[in-house]
């Protein structure tokens, strides 16, 4: 599986997920600088108030 791993509004980059990982994620939240976005492999548990999208196809988390 290949997932995007750039932060917020950086140019798109991808990473090849290891260990048979089947999910990509995109996490979004707001702080004093505005909206922040984090992308990567897996489907992490998030705290209340954080928007999380998990998906299972190559580069689905941009």
Curated annotation (Swiss-Prot):
PROSITE patterns: SNAKE_TOXIN. CDD domains: TFP_snake_toxin. The keyword Repressor does not apply. It comes from the Eukaryota. GO terms for molecular function: acetylcholine receptor inhibitor activity; ion channel regulator activity; toxin activity. It is found in: Secreted. This is Short neurotoxin 1. It comes from Naja mossambica.
């Amino acid at each position: 599986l290949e997932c995007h791993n750039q932060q917020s509004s950086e140019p798109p980059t991808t990473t090849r997920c290891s260990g048979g990982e089947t999910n990509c994620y995109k996490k979004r939240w707001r702080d004093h600088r505005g909206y922040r976005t984090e992308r990567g492999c897996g489907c992490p548990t998030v705290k209340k108030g954080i928007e999380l999208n998990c998906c299972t196809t190559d580069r689905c988390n941009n």
